[in-house]
């Protein structure tokens, strides 16, 4: 039974060792010397790359505008939702408020005496 647990580990480790032995180390100096030659682009490739980047930026800007419009429309829908006043709902609302407020509440936060010793029956000393 123990062999079945270790067999995938053994297979993976054997494959990793095989890959490590089959690869040869390349000096860092040769990589650095050859990189400027590999990064040269022709003028046509530069124009194509610039056009692709510009199209991507325009697409992202349109997506952000659509999301903002949907959020503006969605805010009226959330106002019509039925309110929930159970302890779980109130706790979730307070947690959401705290997470949205960020550092404002954290700067003014004063820790209270909370924990196993704070509420209910306390442990008695065994010395008595």
UniProtKB/Swiss-Prot annotation:
InterPro entries: Calcitonin-like, Calcitonin/adrenomedullin, Calcitonin_CS, Calcitonin_gene-rel_peptide, Calcitonin_peptide-like
Keyword annotations: Amidation, Cleavage on pair of basic residues, Disulfide bond, Hormone, Secreted, Signal
Stretch forming the signal peptide: 1-25
Subcellular location: Secreted
GO terms, molecular function: calcitonin receptor binding; hormone activity; signaling receptor binding
Residues making up the propeptide: 26-80, 125-128
Single GO cellular component term: cytoplasm
Pfam family for this entry, one: Calc_CGRP_IAPP
Disulphide-bridged cysteine pairs: 84-89
Gene Ontology BP annotations: adenylate cyclase-activating G protein-coupled receptor signaling pathway; artery vasodilation involved in baroreceptor response to increased systemic arterial blood pressure; cellular response to nerve growth factor stimulus; detection of temperature stimulus involved in sensory perception of pain; feeding behavior; inflammatory response; intracellular calcium ion homeostasis; negative regulation of blood pressure
Tissue specificity remark: Detected in nerve cells of cerebrum, hippocampus and pons/midbrain in newborns, and only in nerve cells of pons/midbrain in adult.
Modified residues (Phenylalanine amide): 119
Stated role: CGRP1/CALCA is a peptide hormone that induces vasodilation mediated by the CALCRL-RAMP1 receptor complex. Dilates a variety of vessels including the coronary, cerebral and systemic vasculature. Its abundance in the CNS also points toward a neurotransmitter or neuromodulator role. It also elevates platelet cAMP. CGRP1 can also bind and activate CALCR-RAMP1 (AMYR1) receptor complex.
Family classification: Belongs to the calcitonin family.
UniProt-listed PANTHER family: CALCITONIN GENE-RELATED PEPTIDE 2, CALCITONIN-RELATED
Protein name: Calcitonin gene-related peptide 1
Organism field: Mus musculus (Mouse)
